[in-house]
């Protein structure tokens, strides 16, 4: 389905023609700069505009963006599109992300601690691309939920279709065979991960029945050296399991 069917603000705009699947896979084709060190990049500017009534910051910013590629033909990471997924969920369910997460996952899965989710100052909608604050152990429990393919006893919290698309290699994005599924990074060994800036990570390896969660405060949004050290740690854990 096209985004304009769920987000009226996008009617008549390029983003209105983008499908939900294309947003979930970062293949909208919309021009976007995710350079965290460039103060003029899209990711740096997307929350800077003054509020327009109760419209979410990200909608105000992204309404004006235009296609750089035909939808579905080009992969490009965009934090803005993770925000759009959050808005889609809130508009479709009539609930905040925090309420929906609590109802569908946090309480049924027996999370140990309370968590909170930052809200957009203009719309009061939770921000899908960032702002979920939870304990390390509960992040690891989210990974365990993915490892169990969303199953809680005889019930499934996630649909089988979602799990398959989340952990599958839908788009190859590097020469090493790694790629992207539904908002998860897929590695060439079948493992997959949710990776945030400043060192946040949730790593799931079904073949080794392994979940690794990391909360960090790296000095830069992305660090090649620290990423390599983290990968060395993951490799070491896998060797011990073997």
Where are these regions (language model features)?
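Structured C-terminal helix/loop/strand segments within mature extracytoplasmic catalytic/sensor domains
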Residues: 196-242
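Alpha-helical scaffold elements that line and support the substrate/ligand-binding pocket
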Residues: 2, 23, 61-62, 75-105, ...
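Flexible glycine/proline-enriched surface loops and loop-helix/loop-strand junctions
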Residues: 43, 65-71, 81-83, 121-128, ...
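Active-site helix/loop module of the DD-peptidase/beta-lactamase fold
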Residues: 1-31, 64, 92-129, 134
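Amphipathic alpha-helical interface segments
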Residues: 41-52, 58
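Structural helix-adjacent loops and short alpha-helical linkers that scaffold large soluble proteins
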Residues: 90-102, 150-158, 175
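Active-site Gly/Thr loop motif
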Residues: 112-116, 160-213
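Structural recognition of the beta-strand scaffold that forms the well-ordered cores
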Residues: 22-25, 76, 113-117, 131-133, ...
């Amino acid at each position: 389905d096209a985004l304009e069917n769920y987000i009226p603000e996008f009617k008549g705009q390029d983003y209105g023609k983008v499908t939900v699947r294309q947003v979930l896979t970062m293949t909208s084709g919309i021009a976007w700069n995710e350079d965290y060190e460039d103060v003029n990049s899209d990711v740096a500017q997307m929350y800077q505009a003054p509020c327009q009534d109760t419209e979410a910051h990200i909608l105000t910013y992204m309404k004006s963006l235009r296609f750089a590629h035909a939808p579905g033909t080009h992969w490009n990471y965009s934090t803005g599109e993770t925000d759009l997924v959050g808005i889609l969920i809130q508009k479709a369910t009539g609930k905040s992300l925090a309420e929906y997460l609590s109802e569908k996952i946090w309480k049924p899965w027996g999370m140990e601690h309370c968590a909170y989710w930052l809200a957009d100052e203009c719309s009061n909608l939770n921000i899908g691309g960032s702002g979920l604050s939870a304990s390390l152990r509960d992040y690891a429990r989210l990974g365990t939920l993915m490892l169990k393919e969303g199953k809680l006893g005889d019930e499934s919290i996630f649909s089988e279709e979602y799990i398959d698309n989340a952990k599958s290699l839908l788009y190859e994005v590097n020469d090493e065979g790694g790629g992207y599924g539904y908002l998860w990074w897929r590695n060439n060994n079948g493992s997959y991960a949710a990776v945030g800036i400043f060192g946040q990570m949730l790593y799931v390896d079904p073949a080794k029945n392994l979940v690794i969660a990391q909360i960090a405060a790296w000095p830069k949004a992305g660090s090649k050296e620290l990423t390599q050290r983290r990968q060395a740690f993951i490799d070491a854990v896998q060797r011990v399991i073997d």
